[in-house]
């Protein structure tokens, strides 16, 4: 799949789930389940409830995503 096929959206982490999964509320109000990208896992980026994140979704399943960036601050 080409990189252009992904949908990038901003959201807020509202819940932490087991196995580095998170429940994220997107800007449009939808709630998705997201996991951490491999690069964030490798660099030990910590994600807590309330953090602002960027989530990458595929057009095939809009209920699951990948957290690709945690905003500073």
Swiss-Prot record:
Gene Ontology terms for molecular function: ribosome binding; rRNA binding; translation initiation factor activity
SMART domains xrefs: S1
Subcellular location: Cytoplasm
GO cellular component labels: cytosol
Signal peptide: none
SUPFAM superfamilies: Nucleic acid-binding proteins
Domain of life of the source: Bacteria
S1-like domain: residues covered: 1-72
Keywords: Cytoplasm, Initiation factor, Protein biosynthesis, RNA-binding, rRNA-binding
One Pfam family here: eIF-1a
Known function: One of the essential components for the initiation of protein synthesis. Stabilizes the binding of IF-2 and IF-3 on the 30S subunit to which N-formylmethionyl-tRNA(fMet) subsequently binds. Helps modulate mRNA selection, yielding the 30S pre-initiation complex (PIC). Upon addition of the 50S ribosomal subunit IF-1, IF-2 and IF-3 are released leaving the mature 70S translation initiation complex.
Assembly, per entry: Component of the 30S ribosomal translation pre-initiation complex which assembles on the 30S ribosome in the order IF-2 and IF-3, IF-1 and N-formylmethionyl-tRNA(fMet); mRNA recruitment can occur at any time during PIC assembly.
Family per similarity comment: Belongs to the IF-1 family.
Entry protein name: Translation initiation factor IF-1
Organism, scientific name: Legionella pneumophila subsp. pneumophila (strain Philadelphia 1 / ATCC 33152 / DSM 7513)
Gene that encodes it: infA
